[in-house]
């Protein structure tokens, strides 16, 4: 690399001096004890810089306290200020950079310092610096785990990756199946925290958006384009963004995979699939205490923003067209982000341009100090990107000086969605109890005589009918309430732990591991997406975390696990749109979108991260510790057996599922009958769009109901199998439970088959009707064919008879001529042809005459067109001949004029020329003394030559004109001959038509 200029070295020295000043900041313990003033909204009040890790607010909590460990001490004094957590992650050199001779320009000097290889005095200190061999799981534990924990406690959090293009931002945030990124690890950790907090209920919602060319698009709803950013007292928000309530990690990861399908990516010189937009994945967390005794307590509300920024691009990218436009918008938003961070840290009360870009406007509340912020800067050590890496490090150094204050958000009123769901569930349960306990009392029957027995009997029958209808209505209302309670209860997640245990132990222990199941890994890309354009792979060896195995065992395990994942991924993709599986076998109605696969040979991967379990059975056995529906979770051997209360809840849950299954089956049968009726109406009026729309709507409803039925069918056996101990207490043997399950399945299959049979029967009736109609049509066609064949036979017979009659007539005439004696027998007449034969013959002749007439008309039309064309040609030729004659006349006049001029010029010139020549021959001395006559002679000679040339040109033109005149005359003669031929043909045609008419008259009319 070339030597730095002097000015650049001075700037580097000043930066190093700044680092030295930063290193002399107080220690972490001193910072935590120091009570800093709360900054005003929008600008910081302190310019103190620090490079220590931001304080993790994890108080020492009691194990036997009545409150949850996550939410103990919420009403204490406000927490002290923190600095933004800034970490730096290096990616390894790619094979292409190694082949090109790239050198390491920046390196990690320890765990907290980044130093320049060219100028060791230039260094920057951060909370943590990760070497190229560091795994994403280690990055998450340091840079993101405390932010996720705070978000589950009610503190807003923001985690975003910043860096140039192809530095590994998307790999760090999203990862792949071998190394899940920050976003999958955060989602998994959030559900693990729910499992470890048994005395609180949680409601999780997610949204996923992108900022592409300064336009906000909803990735979960492709129709949500160009959304607007609004503001309210709680901060900025996107109007019209779609939020999905998530029930499991696989559910959330499937939404991320579906959103990634709609994200804008493109190819550049550095990346085969480069992110062309910023994405923000938001996890909204609401929680409240469990039980009705804590009904009046506030609901905690927080948002966790996981941001994947697009990489800044330099001029070396050499982009054009759309890519250049995208790069300009990306650089503009990142430049605005840098400006905002600079103004936040300079300590001056100046205007902060949050509104200059959509990205900074959405990050306004996070950067203004409301919540915890973690910045992960991804850099490349290559010398070709040394300047870009230096800019990223300076940006991270400025961001480290931002101060934030983590405070818990509480919602006292009824605006919380979880509070709304809880109140509605409570109200529906009360209504259900009223329906169960309600007793319909009739009017007491008074003593009546024998005369009124019939009247009272009739009234009693009427009352029974009314009571029966009322009972049916109440049963329907009960079923609807059960379905509503089940649907709402599924959305609220609670832990399976029956006892209160603390997440945080006073003594340090092993960190919680994040074991992903196969159904969760299926929604992550198999290979990292941000591929550097290369034909080689760069897989570095990473240490095995928590597993004491040798290098050969680790390689063999990764090889086997890769084969299992490939088999599972292929099976998923063959299915197309697969069904999402939750932790207890529930099927979500979301369609899985598989992220685009990338070539294996063109990737530069971070080190692979081995998981704890290495077999498909082990993964499925320890997939999730939470479940869906009625707040119940799968039984875990680590946390003991379920309590009797939980068992009773599970029994009620199974009953609810069965009731809902019956309701859905009835609804499917009802919708099927409605669809049948609409189909009949559509057959009668196929152009009615309203009926078509109703049919489509009913079909969609039937599909949704069938999908729900399939989901319930899978939930019921799973719930029964997870509670075999409870079944033993209730004297239900496994065989009886299996028989009951099979009975339910068979009954449902029978209902479905009955509905299918009805549909098939209707289709069969329609096909039978169509077959009968086709048979009638075939019989009719056969009859017509038979009649046609008979007519053809009669026609051929009549023709043969006519020919025979003609031959006999000629023979008789010949015989009469030879004998020349007429044989007339008085009183006898010659035999006549049958009248039918004559009629057929006349019809045939009429058809022939019609054909002849049509041919003649066609021929006349053609001749008329040809004659018209010939007349046009003749008139055009006459006009052209006239024009040519006029032109010839003009040229002849001009030729005569030129000839006269030439004659006048030629007459004196030869004499003067001859005399001059003789004079020059006689005496050369006399020519020297007479220059004027010689000049005149030369001028005359030149004039004569010019006139001769003009004359030759005129003669050539005259010859050309003469040739054209001859051609015109020939063309005129040809056209005249053609015209004459045409008239002859017309006359012949008229004559032939006259003869034909005469023949027709003589042949038919005369006879």
Curated annotation (Swiss-Prot):
Transit peptide stretch: 1-53
Primary location recorded for the protein, binned into one broad class: plastid
Quaternary context: Binds microtubules. Homodimer.
Keyword match Chloroplast: yes
Pfam families: Kinesin
Composition bias type Low complexity, residue spans: 1-55
Highest taxon listed in the record's lineage: Eukaryota
The name this protein goes by in its record: Kinesin-like protein KIN-7D, chloroplastic
Molecular functions per Gene Ontology: ADP binding; ATP binding; ATP hydrolysis activity; magnesium ion binding; microtubule binding; microtubule motor activity; protein homodimerization activity
Family recorded in the similarity comment: Belongs to the TRAFAC class myosin-kinesin ATPase superfamily. Kinesin family. KIN-7 subfamily.
Entry-linked PROSITE patterns: KINESIN_MOTOR_1, KINESIN_MOTOR_2
CDD domains: KISc_CENP_E
Subcellular location: Plastid, Chloroplast
Chain spans, region Disordered: 1-79, 579-607, 901-941
GO CC aspect terms: chloroplast; cytoplasm; kinesin complex; microtubule
Function text: Probable minus end-directed motor protein with a microtubule-enhanced ATPase activity. Binds ATP/ADP in vitro. Retains total enzymatic activity even after the removal of the ADP bound in the active site.
Gene name, Swiss-Prot/TrEMBL: KIN7D
InterPro entries: Kinesin-like_fam, Kinesin_motor_CS, Kinesin_motor_dom, Kinesin_motor_dom_sf, P-loop_NTPase
